[in-house]
């Protein structure tokens, strides 16, 4: 509840609690944002528990950039430290809370932990442990003002990290998280690496495109995909450095990347972060049935768009209807045009 209320804060408005109340009984039906905050706390707990279960043989030590994912994560962590610190200093609690949720859930949990957990089984286990604990410890300290109880419980069960070492390398851990040293932006500034962030964002774009296509066409997670990526020379170089990360995450049978590669036949195209990702669907889906489905959706969208345009062409409607109603109709027409463009492009992919 505390975290949810913080995410609802703005600089110039009262907090509006998102509760849906039954008009007759006056009882709470649900609170979507509260449920989302609850899910986030559960995510923090489960991610922390997973990492702590994999700390056998761990000893505290300095974090070291060994992979592109490490460089990306440490850079994002440095920016998170700066963002949260400035949020506290400037009283922008809503932006801070939403920002830390996006960082820990979408970047730490969904990507860094997933990419790094394989290293916990190999020769680089100890350094992977140190890097993960460094990220977790810093994140827990950043989230402590927002949700003090769960973070205190997690931190109390964590091993010491590099943040607890004194100048001689001895462990000097605080008795409680609430009096532990705050992560200072100046100490993390050395990790900021824009090139590393760009490289990993490209990796995420390719993997996300493959996963979205797999989900959209209900393909088995075990089904290997043929993926082709077209981008500029610099981006291709960055992607090649992350090939060993992309291939298992996207579960590719083949991964072809280049500046002038051709779009494969019967493939779906996804454009993200300035790169074109083509996922071959031939042999994976019924192309004729999929094309028929898309054409049916196009017909429905065209019909609705024609209705919107007819209404907007009526001068009486535009003059007499509330401005908000007119704008809503215009927004829907614009949205339908975007939908039609996307659907038409998808049909072309199957041609």
Label for each model-derived stretch:
Residues 19-351:
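Feature 926 captures the class I aminoacyl-tRNA synthetase adenylation module centered on the KMSKS loop
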Residues 1-25:
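Alpha-helical recognition segments enriched in aromatics with Gly/Pro capping
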């Amino acid at each position: 509840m505390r975290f949810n209320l913080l995410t609802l804060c703005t600089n110039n408005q009262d907090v509006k609690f998102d509760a849906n109340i039954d008009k007759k009984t006056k009882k709470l039906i649900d609170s979507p944002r509260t449920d989302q905050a609850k899910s986030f706390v559960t995510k923090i707990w489960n991610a922390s528990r997973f990492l702590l279960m994999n700390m056998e043989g761990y000893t505290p030590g300095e974090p070291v950039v060994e992979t592109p994912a490490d460089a990306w994560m440490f850079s994002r962590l440095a920016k998170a430290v700066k963002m949260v610190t400035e949020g506290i200093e400037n009283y922008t609690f809503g932006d801070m809370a939403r920002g830390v949720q996006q960082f820990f859930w979408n970047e730490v949990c969904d990507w860094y932990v997933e990419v790094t957990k394989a290293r916990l089984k190999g020769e680089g286990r100890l350094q992977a442990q140190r890097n993960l604990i460094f990220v977790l410890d810093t994140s827990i300290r950043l989230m402590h003002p927002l949700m003090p109880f769960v973070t205190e419980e997690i931190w109390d069960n964590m091993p010491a990290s590099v943040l607890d070492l004194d100048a001689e390398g001895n462990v000097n851990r605080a008795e409680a998280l609430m009096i532990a040293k705050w992560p200072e932006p100046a100490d993390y500034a050395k990790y900021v690496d824009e090139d590393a962030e760009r490289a990993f964002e490209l990796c995420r774009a390719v993997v996300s495109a493959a996963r979205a296509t797999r989900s959209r066409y209900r393909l088995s997670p075990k089904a290997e995909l043929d993926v082709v990526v077209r981008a500029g020379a610099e981006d291709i170089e960055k992607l090649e450095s992350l090939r060993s990360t992309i291939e298992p995450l996207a579960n590719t049978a083949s991964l072809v990347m280049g500046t002038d590669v051709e779009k494969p036949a019967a493939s779906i195209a996804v454009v993200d972060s300035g790169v074109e990702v083509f996922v071959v669907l031939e042999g994976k889906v019924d192309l004729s049935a999929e094309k028929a489905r898309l054409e049916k959706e196009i017909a429905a969208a065209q019909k609705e768009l024609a209705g919107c345009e007819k209404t907007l062409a009526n001068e009486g409607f535009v003059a007499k209807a509330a401005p908000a109603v007119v704008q809503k109709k215009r927004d829907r027409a614009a949205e339908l045009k975007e939908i039609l463009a996307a659907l038409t492009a998808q049909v072309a992919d199957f041609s």
